[in-house]
């Protein structure tokens, strides 16, 4: 095999290995994120008013994600909304303020905004 063939073979091997690693790590990372979010949603009783895909008292998480899609200020807005509560955005029923630590709040908001 000449040097061009060796380079091509090495490139294909490296590319294949990288794709293999991505296919193994991406689903696991998503599952961990879902598991972490579910644990936090339960811990802070978010499911009393919200679900992933249908309105209960407040909007579904997917509705929130769709409303704020493409809005670079959405994470900060949603973090403040959860902390301080508010009304008028999704109807007349107000969202009460919540005592969620910043790190957990960031995890939840990132998870919600990533929903499709």
Predicted features by range, described:
Residues 26-41, 56, 67:
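Electrostatic cytochrome c docking/interface patches
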């Amino acid at each position: 095999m000449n040097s061009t063939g060796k380079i091509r073979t090495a490139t294909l091997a490296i590319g294949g290995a990288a794709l293999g690693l991505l296919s193994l790590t991406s689903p696991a990372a998503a599952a961990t994120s879902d598991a972490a979010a579910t644990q936090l949603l339960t811990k802070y009783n978010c499911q009393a008013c919200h679900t992933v895909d249908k309105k209960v008292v407040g909007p579904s998480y997917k509705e929130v994600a769709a409303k704020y899609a493409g809005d670079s200020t959405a994470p900060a807005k949603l973090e403040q909304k959860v902390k301080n509560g508010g009304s008028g955005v999704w109807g007349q029923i107000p969202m009460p303020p919540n005592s969620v630590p910043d790190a957990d709040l960031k995890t939840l908001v990132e998870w919600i905004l990533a929903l499709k």
